[in-house]
Amino acid sequence: MTGGALLVAGTTSDAGKSMVVAGLCRLLARKGVRVAPFKAQNMSNNSAVTVDGGEIGRAQAMQARAAGLDPSVRFNPVLLKPGSDRTSQLVVRGRVTGTVSATDYITHRDRLADVVADELASLRAEFDVVLCEGAGSPAEINLRRTDLANMGLARRAHLPVIVVGDIDRGGVLAHLFGTVAVLHPDDQALIAGFVVNKFRGDPTLLAPGLDQLHDLTGRPTYGVIPYSDELWMDTEDSVSVVAGRTIGRPTPPRGADGLRVAAVRLPRISNSTDIEALACEPGVTVRWVTDPADVADADVVVLPGTKATVADLQWLRTAGLAEPIAAHAGAGRPLLGICGGFQMLCRHIDDAVESRAGRVDGLGLLDADIAFAAEKTLRHRTTPLQGYEIHHGQVTRCAADDWAGIGVRRDAVYGTHWHGLFDNDGFRRAWLADAAAAAGRSGFVVADDIDVSARRDAQLDVMADLLQNHLDLDAALGLVDAGPPPRPTISTGIT
């Protein structure tokens, strides 16, 4: 393998392509292969900060770790961060270049295509294998002319494509067949085969369907990957962040009491992965909520980050959540705001950048004011804790108490711009002990043996092992050097 590449696409968002790429990165890295991830264009508010202060999709940061690499803007040269249904912040090579609508974006397409091509060529020259991840679905045929991340990338770089389908959602055979069938014949020619993901049960029962899929498409299924409830961390797509859903796999408490955490599912939520570390703790149950009753019933409430602070603050009020949040804080129970959630807790927000709403009243639970700056703060932090910052909002006035050098607090109300704080094991344990005491859960015992970073790394090994055991690796990875194999055209394809 020298400079070869493969594109892993998906029938839908959250089909599992990010984890398949991550698992393959880990698998190849174990074998001593120099492998790098690549996603030409990502649309996500779950981002990470590289060591040199650039911004990329969190999935590519995870894939880099799987490959034994530091996250780099080269792995995700174009990032779109939706701030509304019609506009997104455009990040190119890790830096914000402006806010664009879908129509505006088309005008940038040629320039961005050159950026993508340059970065992919550079990676192929440096690494043995580059594993590319598609975006959403390649079957968005209305976007074919401007596509940078799926078949557009595959055409320009002549990449073989494997399509991943999520059978847990139902209809996977139709998804896989239909994805190929609606493609232009030139694009169909690049689809090498399929992977079925998240299968539960006896795979022999699926075999007749896969045989028929092969007959219909002329393409093999390279593997059927079993469902694993260990693969729940580092989710990127907001479609997986569902109100009412419990995060992770709750485990029994070590003491007499558990701790119930309500994480508010904001419409423009960002960096939802901040909450995952809490869900690793025994006795801590974390749920995404939008119901005021769930806030009132919780021991701890978390307001996570958002790409639209002012708009989501208005949503909080309209949804009837502002009052129970204030009542929760007034009762002395723990309330944490992270990044945009922190900004909402302050007295005033001056926003001439994102919403351009001017001065608006915050929830007033922290005695501080926020003003949005045109230039985004991007910092990778190592002291006093590991973490990172991604925000336009700046604290312009603060009469609240300092919180461990990473934020502010008033009694049991906490606010910080730092992401990734709870991945620091000692800090998380100390905060949970304080939160349990403030919530009146005196019987809650903090575990001293939970290593979140090790858990994140372990799930990459889980995925790699699943691929090792359930994927025809010789056939799938053989595509890297061989390129797209001859495949028939489905006659219903669009010409």
From Swiss-Prot:
The active site is at residues 339, 419. Pathway: Cofactor biosynthesis; adenosylcobalamin biosynthesis. GO terms for molecular function: ABC-type vitamin B12 transporter activity; catalytic activity. GO terms for biological process: cobalamin biosynthetic process. InterPro entries: Class_I_gatase-like (IPR029062), CobQ/CobB/MinD/ParA_Nub-bd_dom (IPR002586), CobQ_GATase1 (IPR033949), CobQ_N (IPR047045), CobQ_synth (IPR004459), GATase_3 (IPR011698), P-loop_NTPase (IPR027417). CDD domains: CobQ_N, GATase1_CobQ. The keyword Nucleus does not apply. Catalyzes amidations at positions B, D, E, and G on adenosylcobyrinic A,C-diamide. NH(2) groups are provided by glutamine, and one molecule of ATP is hydrogenolyzed for each amidation. This is Cobyric acid synthase. The gene is cobQ.
